[in-house]
């Protein structure tokens, strides 16, 4: 666990002035910039008081549990406000535990998100596709396990920005084999994604076979489309 992601915001969820500021800031983006959705990252660090912490570094809630009750209330209030004033807007949760009912409506006991990122599917599938084909038959559980929980939430299948940066390599560079095999691997990965239950989220650059990692300070290398393999990949994904 990333220590920075594990800290959350501590006790600030108990302060109403902070809650008001956070919700107002989000609503500003919807009202003034007309965004159509938002993703909340590291939701697990908000939901659990002990997330990423050792014994003695956290205090149980008033019921003796590890749930952050104030953060849960904040998430519900935020989702309620967004959907009340912008009914067509979507909210997404990046949450890497099995916290239940993330995408159920608040009135049904859920947290009110529209979708949850399926991080388990992403990690398992990327691991499988990165293996040499010789070893894939021994790792088919990476492809089948996600079906055990595929309908427990409203999932979106992501290629996270974190998985194509920070030294992890771009999507096509994760694929084994020679030059042609890497392009075939990306086509297979995307085809499997589109056949799997859940909404789809292809990260920028993956659709053209960009070998360089994503860099927030530079644009996508669209000039790659002048090369046959990259252009063929781009067109094949459109057909998919």
Where do the PLM segments sit?
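Aromatic- and carboxylate-lined catalytic core of secreted/periplasmic carbohydrate-active enzymes
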Residues: 76-80, 86-87, 224-238
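Conserved alpha/beta catalytic core and glycan-binding cleft of carbohydrate-active enzymes
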Residues: 34-36, 51-218
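Single conserved hydrophobic/aromatic residue that forms the stacking wall/gate
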Residues: 2-13, 238-239
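Soluble or luminal CAZymes and related metallo-dependent hydrolases
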Residues: 14-22, 67-74, 181-185, 232-236
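An active-site-proximal structural segment forming one wall of the substrate-binding cleft
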Residues: 15-38
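Aromatic-rich peripheral "rim/lid" segments of glycoside hydrolase catalytic domains that contact
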Residues: 215-227
């Amino acid at each position: 666990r990333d220590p920075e992601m594990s800290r959350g915001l501590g006790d600030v969820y108990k302060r109403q002035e902070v809650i008001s500021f956070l919700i107002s800031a989000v609503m500003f983006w919807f009202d003034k910039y007309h965004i159509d959705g938002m993703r909340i990252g590291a939701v697990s660090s908000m939901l659990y008081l002990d997330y990423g912490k050792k014994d003695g570094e956290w205090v149980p809630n008033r019921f003796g549990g590890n749930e952050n009750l104030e953060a849960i209330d904040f998430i519900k209030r935020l989702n309620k406000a967004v959907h009340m004033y912008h009914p067509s807007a979507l909210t997404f949760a990046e949450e890497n535990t099995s916290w239940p009912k993330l995408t159920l409506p608040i009135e049904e006991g859920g947290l009110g998100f529209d979708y949850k990122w399926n991080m388990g599917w992403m990690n398992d599938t990327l691991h499988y596709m990165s293996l040499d084909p010789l070893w894939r038959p021994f790792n088919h559980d990476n492809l089948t396990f996600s079906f055990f929980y595929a309908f427990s939430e409203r999932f979106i299948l992501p290629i996270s920005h974190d998985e194509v940066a920070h030294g992890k390599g771009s999507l096509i560079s994760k694929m084994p084999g020679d030059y042609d095999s890497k392009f075939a691997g990306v086509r297979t990965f995307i085809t499997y994604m589109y056949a799997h239950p859940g909404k789809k989220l292809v990260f920028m650059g993956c659709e053209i076979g960009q070998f360089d990692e994503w860099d927030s300070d530079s644009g996508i290398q669209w000039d790659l489309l002048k090369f046959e393999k990259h252009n063929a990949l781009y067109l094949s994904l459109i057909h998919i």
